[in-house]
A protein has these predicted regions:
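Conserved acidic residues
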Residues: 55-56, 104, 147
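Conserved beta-strand scaffold positions in the cores of enzyme catalytic domains, especially
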Residues: 81, 106, 124-125
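Short beta-strand/turn micro-motifs composed of small residues
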Residues: 83-85, 107-110
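N-terminal nucleotide/polyanion-binding subdomain common to many enzyme families
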Residues: 1-100
Length: 157
């Protein structure tokens, strides 16, 4: 296979709705722990999340909602991150992921993305005039050795 094996990791309600990452009305990390009937299942969700692949795909939009553009820089983790983003991450947000990731790959169609101002050895940018996840997945495997990828994107990809 010329692309990574992908696993979709998501929260979904019984009526089939995906987590509220597609809107700003609710935030999984801030609001779900306060909702009776939902908060009881969160420990299981986070426990399973820790067993996912060492490559994680998400979006800049979701990460902006989680506050990475302002959060203090984290310690390095064993996880490599792939983010799809055109205009949600700031230079601070990009640097946040460089500090956190073994390898950080940004997929963008924005020629002026703030990531182009960051000089970190583990930062790689896949520029695409028109987004093609198929081509991006192939490049992740061939250029960066990504064999397994967990996708968590708040229902927006």
């Amino acid at each position: 296979m010329d692309r990574p094996i992908t696993t979709l990791f998501m929260l979904m309600s019984l009526d089939g709705k995906i987590s509220p990452g597609a809107s700003d009305a609710l935030d999984v990390d801030k609001d779900f722990p306060k909702i009776d009937g939902l908060k009881e299942g969160l420990p299981q969700y986070y426990e399973i999340e820790q067993t996912t692949d060492l490559w994680s795909f998400n979006t800049g939009r979701v990460q902006e909602k989680m506050g990475v553009n302002q959060k203090p820089y984290p310690d390095k983790t064993p996880v490599s991150f792939v983010l799809l983003d055109n205009n949600h991450l700031t230079e601070h947000g990009v640097t946040y992921f460089c500090k956190k990731s073994q390898v950080f790959v940004l997929i963008t169609s924005n020629k002026d993305h703030p990531a182009y101002n960051i000089k970190e050895n583990n930062l790689h940018i896949i520029f695409q005039e028109k987004l093609s996840l198929k081509d991006a997945l192939r490049e992740l495997k061939s250029s960066y050795g990504c064999n397994k990828l967990t996708i968590q994107s708040g229902g927006t990809v």
